[in-house]
Amino acid sequence: MTLCNMNLYEFRQKYNYDVATKMMQQYLDIKFAHLDCLLLFRMGDFYELFYEDAILASNILGIALTKRGKNCEEEIPMCGVPYHALEHYLTKLITENYKVAICDQLETPEEAKKRGGYKAVVTRDVTRIITPGTIIEENLISAAEPNYLTSLVMTKNKKTASICYVDLSTSKIFIVNVPETEILNELARLKSREILLSENLKSSNLADSILKQFNCRITYQVDSFFAINKCEKIILDFYKIRDIKGIGEISSSQICAIGSILEYLSLTQKQNIPNLPIPKIINFHSYMTIDFSTRRNLEIVTNIQGNLHGSVLNTLNHTVTKQGGRLLYHFLSSPLTNIAKINRRLNITEFFYSNLGIVTRIRELLKNTSDIERCLTRITMNRSSGRDLLSIKYTLETAKIINGLFSESHSLNLPNFIGKIIKPLSGDAELYNLIDMSIREDAPNNLNDGGIIKHEFHPKVAQLNDLINNGKLHVEKLKDQYRKETGIDSLKISHNNVLGLFIDITAKNVNKILDPKFIHRQTTVNSVRYTTYELQNLENELVNAQTLVISLEKELYTDICRKVIEKSSYLRILANSLSGLDVFCNFAYIADEYNYTKPEFTNDLSFDIVKGRHPVVEAALLKTSKSFVYNDCHLSEAERICLITGPNMAGKSTYLRQNAIITIIAQIGSFVPAKSAKIGVVDKIFSRIGAADDLIKGQSTFMAEMLETSAILAQSTKNSLIILDEVGRGTSTYDGVSIAWSVLEYIHDKLKCRCLFATHYHELTVMKNFLPALQNYTIAIEESGKDILFLHNIILGTSNKSYGLHVAALAGLPTSVINRAAQILLKFEKISISKGKNIVSTASNNLSLFNFEPQKHISNSKLDEEFKTIDPDKISPKEALELIYKFKKLV
């Protein structure tokens, strides 16, 4: 039995609760309330873990596993980490998708003794639960991408999912409805770190697919966690509204998704949730659909290995701010599909491209701004420091300077859309002055260190700091005052551990002390000692000044933060403006740096790319002083399919990828790597390029290839762009040719969308004779005797060779192996010529490889019954493939 399934009695029995120490009983009580977490239990200067948590954490963190005494003769496993190094160790645990509960001491040992005697246990409780989707600390999350927590709720008919996603670090929250067939595609776009699901979905295909495809934590909740009435009340209470319509027209499942995510934040943050805005309602169709495989194959935001290097994002990202980098990440993850919105972005890019002088100045100034989105979240969640406030101050100051650039540049004719971006840059003088007058420039990270508030901001702060810095002077002043009052020039003020501060006079001067304010404390052989209420008060102030000033500074800091939070709406708008400026100036910069051009968009199936280049490959070649070989791509309603044959290693795959990437870059509002580009808006891009055996998932190369191809054919529309490379290569030649042929027919006749199709099956080139919207292209080469030069140019025509032996020779295979392979190839070519002609003849005569002459129907009662239960409109591609295998067994 796992811990999570234990009731309280079973749990206490397991750990011998009744005979445990009081401290260990306290630990067990808190652990039982957080069975799904690793519990970090504060013990003085360490956070300690016990029992199973300790064993697991010691392995993950690479720290020593020790023990803390015994319980019923059984040693208690224990490991610990220093409290000041907590974030370092949390990073490792969160990276492994663990959920961590932080249990802190809520009082000092001295306070505990006052409360309950010397045996009292310090009060402790969980102050926060940290999960992959609820992190806000800078050291624990990437500054370059969002950190989404997602709640997914299926509608009653299971045809749609409502997905609410929030980036707690920036206080951004969204809600979207997604068709059941598009759920994984939407999750691929979001790349969530943590997903909330109902326990009812625990054994579903959806949960299984999420675990296989995405590196995230799934947190299951009981079904009642998503109950409509409960979730609606949570929303009303959180946003302080009376009617659910106050957050917009949303469905029941959307209410459940939003309410459940707010409840989860409340549980993990212990009610300390930032002021989240009302969720922004997203139209799923407003973004281009790009599935998980395509994102991976095209290496849009990461490379195949999951790293940034070699990705499109890495090549395009010359932003100078963290929030600008995140916005570019969002743009690339979510290309637009609305022409008006795309053109609006392109016009902004064009404006800055036409004014590169101001772009250079803006980019330099933006380097002085801070990530105020995340600063503001830390402030609202009481996890900020004075440096967060200073960051806001410097950003306000810089924004005003940037705004001045536009005002000074009278020659600039500012379009309305630029005016909207720069309007928030005028700043907020009241907020700036508040921070400027109150927060010291050298403010520490830790409020407990003091020294955060300027002395002149508050008279009491000035007074207490004066005591701290000038305590001896105040004692000297009082001594001089008492000398004048008594006429005793030898009067001193001294200190010892028994009396503290005291007035010390010689015995012969005792008759001069006439004022009753001097209170006798002690008589020694040579002197008499006194005190006064004035001296006692000064001593108390000196002793407590440090504590008092830190306490006062915290109060003042909290009040300043409250006033900053009141300006949170403006600060978020300012952050959006600055990040937008950064991204569009970045687009202008790369357009100038790499000679990109403004694309043109249409509502038809146009796809005219002149002298297009692959941005990542080109950037890599430029570093070695080499140039990229550009290529054209022409697709249209009349010529929708480009069938490419040609040798290995000649650039087919690069050509396929570059045209898909150019489309994505264009639809995010950037100029593109081409001489010109005219594109009919693409609603979905699918890419089937290469495959590796996925033995862990039990899928061969061919099965993975067929599943991906099946999904592409099922989900594509007329406005989609399909990129296919070597379909059918994972099986026998004739099976492969047959599948590739049929797939091409389906795309041509049924989908009628644009498609780039690369293949080694030269037999497919004859399809141009009876598929009018298909055109043959090949890779240009130069042959000189046995030598071959790949020119990397895509030209009209066909190729009847793959030049595999030439590539093998380049790879360094032994000459004897190459020569023997050439002999074998010659024999195979002679054998296959006649067979190839037969295949082509059959295909040409029938127009489809699968329109064979029908055979007499052989009755199979089981097969008949199976067919009767199938609704072809409701089964998924994967289910269809499984049925084929099942029918094959029946036959």
Swiss-Prot record:
Binding site for ATP: G646, P647, N648, M649, A650, G651, K652, S653
Entries under PROSITE patterns matching the protein: DNA_MISMATCH_REPAIR_2
Keywords for the protein's UniProt record, in alphabetical order: ATP-binding, DNA damage, DNA repair, DNA-binding, Nucleotide-binding
Keyword check for Mitochondrion: no
Gene Ontology biological process terms in this record: mismatch repair
Pfam family, one: MutS_IV
InterPro entries: DNA_mismatch_repair_MutS, DNA_mismatch_repair_MutS-lik_N, DNA_mismatch_repair_MutS/MSH, DNA_mismatch_repair_MutS_C, DNA_mismatch_repair_MutS_clamp, DNA_mismatch_repair_MutS_core, DNA_mismatch_repair_MutS_N, DNA_mismatch_repair_MutS_sf
The keyword Nucleotide-binding appears for this protein: yes
Gene Ontology molecular function: ATP binding; ATP-dependent DNA damage sensor activity; damaged DNA binding; mismatched DNA binding
Function recorded in the entry: This protein is involved in the repair of mismatches in DNA. It is possible that it carries out the mismatch recognition step. This protein has a weak ATPase activity.
Family stated for the protein in its record: Belongs to the DNA mismatch repair MutS family.
Record-given protein name: DNA mismatch repair protein MutS
Biological classification of the source: Bacteria, Pseudomonadati, Pseudomonadota, Alphaproteobacteria, Rickettsiales
Gene that this polypeptide is encoded by: mutS
